[in-house]
Amino acid sequence: AQVAAEAEKFLVGLAASIGATGETVVNIQGDDIEVQLNGAELGLLVGPRGSTLQAVQDITRVVSQRRMGDHDTRLRIDIGGYRAKRKEALSRFVTQVADEVVATGSARALEAMPSPDRKIVHDALTGRTDIVTHSEGEDPNRRVVISPAAPVASAE
């Protein structure tokens, strides 16, 4: 709870430093803490495709954990509901790509994306039996490849 309070204080101060105001909502489950910062004019803290948000999360985690001496807590930051919106949009997109892969029979490599986005892709398509996904390459150029599933041999 102390890490959460420290993270809240840091985020509100960060928002103020760019001339924005925000309110925080904290959700704590065991060692997992999620702090949501909501308000107007916070887009600068999200950045293109959430790249700045990831940096804000990393800095907030380091500052909060060091100040509290707690390095076991997992801290996740969301700003303006970006992560939920990104998950929904990315899930919709990769479902369409998977449908195209099945229709054409050709694999398709997605653009390079950070680890949290790759996890969304794999999770969104995990229940499908007509395609397979895997990641290839090295960060920051690691990408997900969606391929048609190998045909199942019929037992005759």
Can you annotate each of these PLM segments?
Residues 1-156:
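RNA-contacting regions in translation and RNA-metabolism proteins
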